[in-house]
Structures are given as C-alpha cells and as structure tokens.
UniProtKB/Swiss-Prot annotation:
Keywords: ATP-binding, Ligase, Nucleotide-binding, Protein biosynthesis
Classification via PROSITE patterns: AMIDASES
Reaction catalysed by this enzyme: L-glutamyl-tRNA(Gln) + L-glutamine + ATP + H2O = L-glutaminyl-tRNA(Gln) + L-glutamate + ADP + phosphate + H(+)
Family: Belongs to the amidase family. GatA subfamily.
Gene3D superfamilies, sorted: Amidase signature (AS) domain
Cited Pfam families: Amidase
Protein name in the entry: Glutamyl-tRNA(Gln) amidotransferase subunit A
Length: 481
C-alpha cells in the first residue's frame, strides 16, 4: 500500500476499496519497523486506530468526509495536542502532557485528519541537524551516517520514509525548509502570521511559524488551506483572506515568470555539487519560459548575524518559564527554591539551548543592548526594505536551500558557528517574514538530495507552490521510500 499523493488515497477511501483502519494500521507498522531511527518521540497506536474506526463509521453513516479525511499526519514534538506527551525533545519537559490543542491541530481534526505520532526534533527547535535532541539524532533517509537537517528533522524523515503523508513542523530560521532539502521533500514556511502560533511552544516569537512537510506541493497546499487563517488566540495571526491555494497553483504559468537570482545566494565557497544541481534546476525553469533575472540583495552573512542575536534574545525570555516548578523535570538534589531553579535548568536543558539562553541574556544586558540587539533590529529592517524592493522587479527569488549537502552525524557538533551557516540561505526569508519553500530538484555526486529555495512576496503561497510544483515536475524528483 503506497500513495504518493493524498488524492489517490482519498479516492480509495471514499470508494470503500480501503478503510481508514487498514491504512492507519499499515502506516503504524511502518513506523514500528523504523523505531531504531528515532524518527518519532511518541507513536499514537491506540488513539490513531480509534480515530480511524470513528472515521470509517462516519463514512458508513453517509456523512460528508472532511478535506483531510483519513490522511495520516505526524506532528513535530513542539505542537500541542491535548492528552499527548509534549517534550520538545528536551529532558526538562520529561513526563509533560499537552492540556489543550493547538489551533492548527483543531482545524485538522475538524477536517478528519488522523495523527499517527510526534516527531523528533532539535531541542526546543534550536539546531540544524536534529542532533540536539534528548533522545538522540535521526539518520538521513538517503544515508544513515548523515543528518536529516533540523530542527524538524524527524518530520522530514517521516515523510521521506513514507511513515505519514504530511508532517507539521515549525520554522524559525529554516527548520522546515532545510530538512526538506536534506530529505528530498517539500518544506513550506508560510508568511509570518499566516498560521496561528497558538499551541506552538515558543522559541523566538517574532520568527516562529508552523510549516508543512509533504512529498508534493499539492498535499502541502491542501494542508495549508486547512490550517491557515486568523485566530483570536494569536494576536500575530493575519486577517488576510485565505485563498483557494490549489486553484491559484493551477493558474501559475512559467511563461514570462521573472525569477530573481541573487549573487548573494551563489558565493564562491558554495558547494560545487549544490551549485551545479541548483543551476540546472533554474535552467529548466528558463527553458520552460521563465526569465532568470540577476538581482542584488544584502549578503546573507549579515542576516545570519542579526538572526542569531534576535532569536537568542527572544529565546532567553521565552524559555524562562521552564524552571522545574510547575511541570516537567525537577532536580531532586535542591535544598532550596533558588537551587531548584538553577539545578533543574542546568540538568534539564541541553548544551545548545543553554548556549542560546546565555547569548540571548548577554545581548539584552545593560551596555550591550544598543550594540547588539538594537543594531540587529536595524539590519532586519534593511533586509525587509531590500526584499520589498526586489519584488518590484521579480515574481520569485530562487537559490539553494543549503550551502552544502547533508553532512555527517557529529561533523559540525563541535563548531556551532559552522552549524549555524546551514541556515544561511533560509534565514533571510525568516527575517523579512515572507513565505518560502524548499523543493527537491536533484542529487549530488554521492546521491544526496539537493533542494531549490523559493521566496515569494507576502501571502503569495499559492503562486509560490505553483512554481514549486512546476519545478519539481521538470526535475522529476521523488522522495525516498
């Protein structure tokens, strides 16, 4: 039983050739067969099968099936789902269960989705390799000695291994797109505010956005259409109308499309294989009628510097709530309240999370606020202005998703700065808040996936996914099984 597109599965379910229970049983068996890969932090065996039976009964009663009827979906372990464990892949949330549903979860449940489990991630979404996880790393589906990317590495690996049809992730600076590129799947980060953050555990609140990982752009668009939209429980969610994404995609033509290609996305030190595969993909767009336009944008290195100042500052504030007093891990060897706070956080957080909390506290401290935090906010505004100007000349901006292919497990753990550069091409879209997607376009000389990164103007997800779908079809890539 294998379906690379949800519409194929849906037709089998609605025609009664298959039942939801049969489908979910198959997916759960696959998940169990991959348990040694650490892809899931929790598997919802009983709940998923019970939900499948409920949906089968609904169809038997002749009731209208939802948009996502019977779709097996995985959830990153930082998105709340009532009654399910929620750990953010951290020791400090050991034993915690969600007490409410995220808005995205509510909306998917209302459309008859079935959740099969929670996926592994970098602790509190801080990382680019999925190695910063309390339960261990996830191997890349194409080479088990390499990383799947991060922080949504488990979600990307789950889709690539066909353990679910779609997975939710979160994207702060590239955490959906970079693992999408590393695992040969579509990784979508929508416009900031397009999807409610209610129920998403906060890392950096002015950057965080729930995203979608899928085998193809159609399934990503379908899920986006369900979970997008304003939410009274999230003041940053946008009132911008949610369009029919699939219809918008169908009306996208490559003929005359202006594709901006910034020199900043093709530096001299870019991996040669990555550069070759990406340029070949862009050439296919050009051959199909698009116009490649050279544009100038600020160097991505400035975005990385500003990004890591701003997100660490926000993280130091957001993670102050994890203190061992109300939920999660509490240090057993604490003679007083102050010691309990210190010991619980010291023992509960991993090295990378502690590094970012300390850095964030430093840049917000007296004497350094103007030098670092204020200056980074100014850089952010410059990027926003320059990207707005760029979209007066082009329809989409394209480049590599990552400066290098999936790297070996352990290769960059001793060099945080080198690890941070994995997001050098994805961070600019996060700084400006524009939608972006990684789409599979080919493989390097070792057979490792390479993705093209597309950025569109605010709320142009439909157009962007239409371009991505055309590009994926031209390159004829398919996820690993």
């Amino acid at each position: 039983m294998q379906f690379r597109r949800y519409e194929d599965l849906r037709s089998k379910l609605l025609s009664r050739e298959l039942t939801c229970e049969q489908v979910i049983s198959e997916y759960l068996q696959r998940i169990d067969s991959k348990k040694d890969d650490n892809i899931f932090t929790a598997v919802f065996h009983e709940a998923a099968l019970e939900r499948a039976r409920e949906l089968d009964a609904k169809l038997e009663r002749g009731e209208e099936p939802g948009v996502l009827f019977g779709m097996p979906i995985a959830i990153k372990d930082n998105i709340s789902m009532k009654g399910a464990p929620l750990s953010c892949a951290s020791k400090i949330l050991d034993g915690y269960e969600s007490v409410y549903d995220a808005t995205a979860i509510e909306r998917m449940v209302a459309e008859d989705a079935i959740f099969v489990g929670r996926t592994n991630m970098d602790e509190f979404a801080m990382g680019s390799s999925n190695e910063n996880s309390a339960i261990g790393p996830v191997p890349n589906p194409f080479d088990k000695t390499r990383v799947p990317g991060g922080s949504s590495g488990g979600s990307a690996a789950a889709v690539a291994n066909d353990l679910c049809m779609v997975a939710l992730g979160s994207d702060t600076g590239g955490s959906v797109r970079q693992p999408g590129g590393f695992c040969n799947v579509v990784g979508l980060k929508p416009t900031y505010g397009r999807i409610s953050r209610y129920g998403l555990v906060a890392f950096a609140s002015s950057f965080d956005q729930i995203g979608v990982l899928a085998a193809n752009c159609d399934d990503a668009a379908l899920v986006l259409g369900v979970i997008a939209g304003q939410d009274d429980r999230d003041a940053t969610s946008s009132h911008h109308e949610v369009p029919d994404y699939e219809s918008t995609m169908d009306h996208v033509s490559l003929e005359g499309l202006r594709v901006g290609v910034p020199s900043a996305f093709f530096p001299e030190n870019l991996n040669a294989d990555v550069a070759g595969v990406v340029k070949a993909g862009l050439k296919k767009l050009e051959d199909a009628g698009a116009e490649l336009v050279e544009i100038e944008l600020p160097e991505s290195d400035y975005a990385i510097a500003a990004y890591y100042i701003l997100v660490t500052a926000e993280a130091s504030s957001n993670l102050a709530r994890f203190d061992g007093a109300r939920y999660g891990y509490r240090s057993p060897d604490s003679p007083d309240l102050s010691s309990m706070y210190v010991n619980s956080r010291t023992e509960g957080f991993g090295a990378e999370v502690k590094r970012r909390i300390m850095l964030g506290t430093y840049v917000l401290s007296a004497g350094y606020y103007d030098t670092y935090y204020k200056k980074a906010q100014q850089v952010r505004r410059v990027f926003q202005e320059k990207y707005r100007e760029a979209f007066e000349k082009v329809d989409v901006i394209a480049g590599p998703t990552s400066p290098f292919p999936p790297f070996g497990i352990g290769d960059k753990m001793d060099n945080p700065l080198e690890m941070y550069l994995a997001d050098v091409f994805t961070v600019p879209a996060s700084i400006v808040g524009m939608p972006a997607v990684s789409v599979p376009v080919g493989f390097d000389s070792l057979g490792l996936p390479v993705g093209v990164h597309l950025i569109c103007n605010f709320f142009e997800e439909g157009k962007m996914l239409g371009i991505a779908r055309n590009l994926q079809a031209l390159c004829q890539t398919a996820p690993s099984n």
